[in-house]
Every structure is written in C-alpha cells, then in structure tokens.
C-alpha cells in the first residue's frame, strides 16, 4: 500500500519542477556561435550572439584563453584582429591573414550568474604548393618505360595528386602522405609508369594537385617528353599524273625522330643506285617512256631505315592543247567571225546593186553628151506604160 501512495507525490514534484526545466532548456542568456573554415592567408569572421544579455558584455578569447575583445574594447594588441560589430546582443570580430597557428577553439563568454560560454572551432586550410615532377632525364626510345615522380608540400589536410597525358588520364600509384616538420601540413607524392610510343613524342605529362583550399583552381606542372623512333617514308609525285615530255619530281617524305638525314633512290632492275643525297627529291627533267618502272626510296636516320616504293607509269603526251595553242585558236576564231560578217555584208550589197541596176544606168546617161536623147528615151519609156502595144524606140 505504501508504493501506490507515493506515486501522486512524485507526479506533484515533477509538475512543480517542469517550469524550471523549461527555462533551462530555453536559456535566453546562452550565447551561440558557429564553426568556421578559412584558407591560410584569408580572413575569418567570428560572430557571437545572445538574446538576453542581462546587462553584461560579450567577450571573445583565443585558444590560448587570451582575451581578444571585451565588448568594443580591444584587449590584445594584434592589428590582424578588428572589431566588426559590438551591440548588447552581438559581438563580431575579424582575423585577417590567418595563419595555421590561428587554428583552434575560440570562446565567446558572457559574464552572467553563472558565466555562460560558446565555442567556435576555426579550421585553417593549408594551401598545397605547385607540384614538382622529377624522374625524366633524357629522350626515350620507342617501347621503353617512362617513370615520373610528382610531389607537393604544404597542404592541410593532405592533398591528392592525379596524372594525365594530354587529355588522357594516367593511373599512377596511390598518393603517399608524409607530415611536414611543422606538424600541421603534409607533403604528398605519387609516381606513374607507362610504355612510350611514337605518338607520345612531344606529349605533355601533367601532374595536378586537388585540394579544397584551391576552390576548383588548377594547380599543376607538366613535363614534355621526347621519344626516338625509326623513320617512315612515302613517295609523292609532282605532277600526280605525269606524261611523256613533262618534268617530274618524286618527293620522298621521311618522318621520324630524329628526322631522316639520308635518302637513297633505286630503280628495280638497274644498278647502281640512282641517287644518294641529303635531299629527298628525285628529278626527271624530261620524262621518257623508258623512265616507267618501280622506284624505291630508303630514308635513313641513326634509329634505322625505311624503304618506300612507287610505280611510275609514263603516259602519252597530253592531248590537251597548250596555252599558246589555245591563244592561237581564240585569235583564229575571231578572224573567222570577222570574215563571216564581211561575206554577209558583200552578199547584201550585191543583192542591193542588182535590184537597182536600171536606175543607176539611167542617172549615168544623164551626165553624158547625148543627154537630150537620153531625156527623150526616158519620156518615151514613161509613155510606154500607157501606150498599149505600140512599138517604141529608145535611145540610150
């Protein structure tokens, strides 16, 4: 019976303490802050707020418990620390040119009864240095293995390293991490190995460092590599379709690293070699049918040799007229057209003269010594148009 009688008493005590408990959970005099992250060399703002200051001032102190500001009054002589805002409900300060040593817990206090505090954890990011690539000493031969090392110091937290060749990602080994002597930052390193090909000649191998302090900015170093490889060659004719009587150049286009320094021309079935020179062209000043055949060009460097072949077929002389023949044809066409026009004019002129021959002779007769007789002839001729069948005599 004793236990049930004690239950109402416990409930009564709980109800009597409830308001006090609610006040403690909603303490208007409790200040609040927030954690901050800043890059080394940057500026951080510490903000402390309180709802009920109880006629007391707010105070900021550093991890060493040195007072920085008490209200609007500076307490520590450090020009990097400046007052941003000071009101009964807020105290904000800024720290510029932040160093790694500034990292830690900063305390905001209000001197009420009891004293209330709030913590702000300041994290300082160490910026990684530009990476350094080592391991490349001299040019590599095709199919040899290249091994490069990359290293970057000063990052906090430790950075990550990545490799690429042009736009192609290279898979290096896992990033190695080593703590720097200051005990705060880290040195990271990575290596990459790959077999080189002739396509890698002149390629840039890039090592990049990735870190949150860079905020997406690129921080990388590149190493250009040189690859030595055997030459290749191809023969290009100029003109592309040679004909008998033309001038022909056969260009032997050699490629390689190093570039071929010697070219030897041969024709199948003929001895000795046609030409041995440092220049790559074989010249035919005047092509003949006998020049047809298969020609070989051997390009040589200190990495080796390569022979390219070309079959030459000399075609018959071009039926296409030369420029001078074309010019003469144009002149001949113009002359023929002019002659044709003159003939047309002569035909029309002859036809005109035939139709007007009588009139021409009559006028000519008027100018002679027998002009009276001529007039008589003209009159008689005119009268003859109405005289029927009478016989008329004319004097011309």
From Swiss-Prot:
It comes from the Eukaryota. Residues 1-22 form the signal peptide. It is found in: Cell membrane; Cell junction. This is Cell adhesion molecule 3. Coiled coil: none annotated. CDD domains: IgV_1_Necl-1. Glycans are attached at residue 288. The chain crosses the membrane at residues 329-349. Residues 23-124 form the Ig-like V-type domain. SMART domains: 4.1m, IG, IGc2. Disulfide bonds join 48-108, 150-207, 252-297. The keyword Oxidoreductase does not apply. The modification Phosphoserine is found at residue 386. Residues 350-396 are cytoplasmic. Keywords: Calcium, Cell adhesion, Cell junction, Cell membrane, Disulfide bond, Glycoprotein, Immunoglobulin domain, Membrane, Phosphoprotein, Repeat, Signal, Transmembrane, Transmembrane helix. The cytoplasmic region mediates interaction with EPB41L1, DLG3, PALS2 and CASK. Changing residue 136 to C: Nerves from mutant mice exhibit abnormal axonal organization. Residues 23-328 are extracellular. GO terms for molecular function: protein homodimerization activity. It is a single-pass type I membrane protein. Its main location: membrane. InterPro entries: CD80_C2-set, Ig-like_dom, Ig-like_dom_sf, Ig-like_fold, Ig_sub, Ig_sub2, Ig_V-set, Neurexin-like.
């Amino acid at each position: 019976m004793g236990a049930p009688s004690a239950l109402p008493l416990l409930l009564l005590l709980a109800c009597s303490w409830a308001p006090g408990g609610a006040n403690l959970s909603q303490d208007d005099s409790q200040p609040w802050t927030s954690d901050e992250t800043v890059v080394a060399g940057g500026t951080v703002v510490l903000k402390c707020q309180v709802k009920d200051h109880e006629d007391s001032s707010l105070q900021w102190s550093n991890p060493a418990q040195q007072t920085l500001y008490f209200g609007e009054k500076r307490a520590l002589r450090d020009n990097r620390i400046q007052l941003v805002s000071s009101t009964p409900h807020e105290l904000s300060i800024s720290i510029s040119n932040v160093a790694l040593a500034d990292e830690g817990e900063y305390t905001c206090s209000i001197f009420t009864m009891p004293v209330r505090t709030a913590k702000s954890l300041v994290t300082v990011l160490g910026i990684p240095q530009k990476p350094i690539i080592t391991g490349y000493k001299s040019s590599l031969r095709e199919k040899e293995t290249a091994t490069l090392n990359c290293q970057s110091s000063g990052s906090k937290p430790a950075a990550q390293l990545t490799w690429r060749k042009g736009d192609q990602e290279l898979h290096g080994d896992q990033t190695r991490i080593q703590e720097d002597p200051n005990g705060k930052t880290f040195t990271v390193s990575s290596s990459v190995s790959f077999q080189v090909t002739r396509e890698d000649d002149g390629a840039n191998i890039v090592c990049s460092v990735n870190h949150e302090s860079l905020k997406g900015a690129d921080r990388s170093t590149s190493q250009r590599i040189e690859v030595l490889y055997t030459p290749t060659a191809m023969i290009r004719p100029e003109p592309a379709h040679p004909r008998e009587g033309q001038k022909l150049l056969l260009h032997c286009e050699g490629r390689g690293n190093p570039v071929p320094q010697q070219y030897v021309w041969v024709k199948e079935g003929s001895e000795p070699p046609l030409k041995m020179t440092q220049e790559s062209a074989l010249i035919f000043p005047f092509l003949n049918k006998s020049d047809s055949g298969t020609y070989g060009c051997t390009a040589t460097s200190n990495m080796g040799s390569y022979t390219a072949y070309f079959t030459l077929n000399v075609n018959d002389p071009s039926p296409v007229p030369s420029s001078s023949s074309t010019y003469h044809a144009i002149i001949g066409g113009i002359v023929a057209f002019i002659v044709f026009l003159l003939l047309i004019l002569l035909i029309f002129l002859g036809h005109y003269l035939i139709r007007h021959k009588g009139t021409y002779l009559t006028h000519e007769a008027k100018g002679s010594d027998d002009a009276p007789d001529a007039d008589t002839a003209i009159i008689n001729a005119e009268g003859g148009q109405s005289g029927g069948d009478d016989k008329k005599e004319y004097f011309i």
